[in-house]
Amino acid sequence: YDHWIARDLAAYLFLAENRDSDASLLRIVNKPKRYISKDLLAEAEQMPYGLLRSLHVCPSLQKWQAEHLESLEEDLRQIQKRKPYEALRYVRKVVGYDEYLSDYAVYRKASLSNMIEIADEITETAKGTESGTEFVRKMEELSRQMKEQSKQKGNTHGVTLTTFHGAKGLEFGAVFLPSLAEGIIPYEKGRKGSALEEERRLFYVGLTRTKDRLFLSFTENRYEKPLKPSRFLMEMGLDERLFFKENRRKF
């Protein structure tokens, strides 16, 4: 919950409720790209207003930059109308944060599926919260709890929630790999060439973290859309005949 993706998503919600939060604006102003330059931001910081308001009245503000700012303002209004879970989905799918992650992954040669996995986890965390402020507090509390748990010594019993990247070098008695469906692993944007190979390597990392037991599962639906089992399951020699359904539950 201290990951920069979590902080980005929280910043959108916090800014929607607190337009004077300069720190939140600076964090997301170009995520996705809005072409608000460092020079323009420096100019706005010299004005006696909040940063967002100041940007609108900067003498050097170009028309196309103003249009991006107006679009951001409208997005913030839409975010403010929604509860955190729906607001984060809006940020990711409508504002374009997931597309920003896709561009970032290409630029940094990073795993897009890992970043989407983190964004999905943060989005799920928002369920049950009523405001951006409550969501931010919930993340802060979860982060505090995880740090406290990591400090505890001598307790060998527990559950570790981690990403494929975070699991490298670790070993567990039992490993659960959920959501092994096309569009999740591999992620829909990373299905070709080196990106696909990177996702396959990460999947192998997950498989090999176990000493005794390995549990693989997939979800039939996501955001009300049907899904198919991951191709990586098929590559292991598994096929859909091994998935049985009884009373709408997978076994």
PLM feature spans:
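Accessory C-terminal helicase-associated subdomains
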Residues: 60-166, 187, 244-246, 250
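Solvent-exposed polar/charged
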Residues: 34, 46, 93, 208-209
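ATPase/helicase motor core of nucleic-acid motors
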Residues: 1-84
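Conserved helicase core region in the C-terminal RecA-like lobe
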Residues: 134-187, 198, 202-222
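Short glycine-enriched, charge-decorated loop/helix-capping segments at active-site entrances
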Residues: 190-194
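Helicase C-terminal subdomain and adjacent C-terminal extension
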Residues: 221-251
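A generic structural signal for residues located within well-ordered alpha-helices
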Residues: 20, 114-117, 172, 198-200, ...
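Extended, charge-rich low-complexity interaction segments
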Residues: 22-45, 136-147, 237-245
